[in-house]
Amino acid sequence: MAVLGKPKGHNRYRDPRTFEMTPALLRVRAPFFARNMIGLALATSIPLGVYLYTVDMLSKDEFSDIPIPPIADDELAKLKKEYEDKKNSS
């Protein structure tokens, strides 16, 4: 009994030597190109908008209203020494 269909190893949508798309595949995909590009634009614009909004809000943030606690010079020297020791040991 003969099996109908394409020959084994044959793909009519890809060139078997270069694996490039054939004109048949390009014709099949053509009606979906515009909708796919609109979907891609929507899918990328939402996260991009959230990112840009976040960067904009963070750049406007001011820390001038937060008081910096006073620190004595000897405490500052002690903290710097601890920081340097930790940095050198790592």
Swiss-Prot record:
Intervals, Mitochondrial intermembrane compartment: 55-90
Subunit structure: Component of 250-400 kDa complexes called cytochrome oxidase assembly intermediates or COA complexes.
InterPro entries reported in the protein's UniProt record: Coa3 (IPR041752)
Any one GO cellular component localisation term in the record: mitochondrial inner membrane
Family stated for the protein in its record: Belongs to the COA3 family.
Membrane topology: Single-pass membrane protein
Native source organism of the sequence: Debaryomyces hansenii (strain ATCC 36239 / CBS 767 / BCRC 21394 / JCM 1990 / NBRC 0083 / IGC 2968) (Yeast)
Signal peptide region: none
Main location: mitochondrion
Subcellular location(s) per record: Mitochondrion inner membrane
Annotated function: Required for assembly of cytochrome c oxidase (complex IV).
Cysteine pairs bridged by disulfides in the record: none
Residue spans crossing the bilayer: 32-54
Lineage: superkingdom: Eukaryota
Keywords: Membrane, Mitochondrion, Mitochondrion inner membrane, Transmembrane, Transmembrane helix
Record topological domains on the Mitochondrial matrix side: 1-31
Gene: COA3
Coiled-coil residue spans: none
Protein name in the entry: Cytochrome c oxidase assembly factor 3, mitochondrial
GO biological process, one term: mitochondrial cytochrome c oxidase assembly
